[in-house]
Amino acid sequence: MQPTGNQIQQNQQQQQQLIMRVPKQEVSVSGAARRYVQQAPPNRPPRQNHQNGAIGGKKSSVTIQEVPNNAYLETLNKSGNNKVDDDKLPVFLIKLWNIVEDPNLQSIVHWDDSGASFHISDPYLFGRNVLPHFFKHNNMNSMVRQLNMYGFRKMTPLSQGGLTRTESDQDHLEFSHPCFVQGRPELLSQIKRKQSARTVEDKQVNEQTQQNLEVVMAEMRAMREKAKNMEDKMNKLTKENRDMWTQMGSMRQQHARQQQYFKKLLHFLVSVMQPGLSKRVAKRGVLEIDFCAANGTAGPNSKRARMNSEEGPYKDVCDLLESLQRETQEPFSRRFTNNEGPLISEVTDEFGNSPVGRGSAQDLFGDTFGAQSSRYSDGGATSSREQSPHPIISQPQSNSAGAHGANEQKPDDMYMGSGPLTHENIHRGISALKRDYQGASPASGGPSTSSSAPSGAGAGARMAQKRAAPYKNATRQMAQPQQDYSGGFVNNYSGFMPSDPSMIPYQPSHQYLQPHQKLMAIEDQHHPTTSTSSTNADPHQNLYSPTLGLSPSFDRQLSQELQEYFTGTDTSLESFRDLVSNHNWDDFGNNVPLDDDEEGSEDPLRQLALENAPETSNYDGAEDLLFDNEQQYPENGFDVPDPNYLPLADEEIFPHSPALRTPSPSDPNLV
């Protein structure tokens, strides 16, 4: 059946609509952009020719099919055996390649014979019929501008060149690009769109900024890391500093305690070793701990020899330190023999008394003291020293007991130490004797041997001021009538004397003219007939102090404490020996301040204090005013009516240290 004219006309209109159809860019499901490629025209009848599109008597038809990008690339790769990178191909170049390669548009646009350029034969038809199918506009000037942006150059034939404008621009256009070549679609990836100078500059600036930002970020990361490390180090240093200060505080406390220990030890050793403090009194070792056996044999733990002042302080201190170090290193079990402990006695003793003189005490004393000393014997039952932890004090007796007819029995072995000087030791007996205010003794029938001495000027008077202060209460009795003080009789003494120094009456001023009388002389008379004749004799030469004995338990405790103390300071004994040996001990004590120079301080020259003497608090406020005003002394409720009152010398009212002696068989006073 032959198609009618209407059918032919309808087919032509459909083909025309198909040719003039404007394709739309769609996005597939996978997100890939679709491009349009030229397809081969379908088979048509011979009479179905496109009349309007025919130029120069040639007619053709073009069908455009929308295909995915991958299919287009495969088509290009199969045709040219070359691979093209789809991601780098602009859409404009792909559409331009499809337009030039379309065989149906050869009458409008086609390749040059050389294949290096393409020609647009009819720009009017190209902008009217071709551009709307591939682009969204039909502006030929916009197409030319796009070609210039991608580097295409307009080619002008030499035959038509010249300064005058011709009509060839409207009739014919030719463009070329080194990478837009016929049959070489792989070169399309090398065609790049031109960028403006501002865009290039902005891009360079952005790149430089990005590089700088990366550098800054790297530096910031490094700085953060360094800051973290510094913070860790600071925390560590802070902790170490805190620990160091804590250790320093503990070391300071320990150092302060050690300084206190060594100051006490140095003060004690200096006071013991210094021979210039007193010409009559010396001090023996550190607490005179004598390990004596009851049988009298001298062992390795026997008591140390008494210090000799002629050997010098250097040798004494060195010997003392060596002995202390040796005793602390000695085993504790070897220190006590025969189940006995140390004998602790007063460290004050007189020069020249040898330990040999302490051997036989029964040559000097009677049976009573020998019986008391029997507790130190080796044999027999358990003594009282072993039963009681408290020290046992043996009461001494005067050596004048032989004058009253007492039997003198000498013990075989007896250690006599010098104890503290007290009124109980001086005035032995049940009660005190009587003595009038003038110093006369009823037993002797005459004045006592006490004498007065004029008060010294300068430092002597000032030193006597403190000494005389305990006896200022005696001035109350000056204006009162003479009276006696009751007291008991002591068999060891043949005279009367008060039991309290505060009860000594004030001596009138006319007695100060007697040079050989002393105000307070404690008489130890051997015979009543010779008591008044021996005025220059030492009143304390035949006195002695009790011996203090300790129980073994207390001895062990004391020895253990001493051992622990000296063991803790053993490492510093060598340095302490060097310190003591380098000191000039000859000048020590020369600049000792007087008592009244430092108010409230103890007298460094006062060796012993009487137990029954008035306390310092009773006369502390009045002793400074006692000798300043010669008229009246209204202080603490008493007055001195005598304006001629003068202070007594220091040795008259209270000696520096009463002469305490341990009797020896060779003493001529014991005969």
Curated annotation (Swiss-Prot):
Null mutant: what phenotype? RNAi-mediated knockdown increases susceptibility to Gram-negative bacterium P.aeruginosa in wild-type and in a daf-2 mutant background. Abolishes both median and maximum lifespan extension caused by starvation. Fails to prevent paralysis due to proteotoxicity under starvation conditions. Prevents the heat shock-induced increase in lgg-1/Atg8 punctae in body-wall muscles, nerve ring neurons and proximal intestinal cells. Accelerates death upon exposure to the Gram-negative bacterium P.aeruginosa PA14.
SUPFAM superfamilies found in the cross-reference section: Winged helix' DNA-binding domain (SSF46785)
Q: Which GO terms describe its biological process?
A: ascaroside biosynthetic process; dauer larval development; defense response to Gram-negative bacterium; defense response to Gram-positive bacterium; determination of adult lifespan; innate immune response; negative regulation of gene expression; nematode larval development
Q: Does the keyword Ubl conjugation apply?
A: yes
Q: State which tissues express it.
A: Expressed in intestinal cells, body wall muscle cells, and hypodermal cells, as well as many neurons in the head and tail.
Q: Where is the composition biased (Low complexity)?
A: 1-17, 38-52, 439-456
The UniProt entry, under PANTHER family, shows: HEAT SHOCK FACTOR PROTEIN, HEAT SHOCK TRANSCRIPTION FACTOR
Function summary = Functions as a stress-inducible and DNA-binding transcription factor, playing a central role in the transcriptional activation of the heat shock response (HSR), leading to the expression of a large class of molecular chaperones, heat shock proteins (HSPs), that protect cells from cellular insult damage. Upon exposure to heat and other stress stimuli, activates gene transcription through binding to site-specific heat shock elements (HSEs) present in the promoter regions of target genes, such as the HSPs. Binds to inverted 5'-NGAAN-3' pentamer DNA sequences in HSEs.
Listed name of the protein: Heat shock transcription factor hsf-1
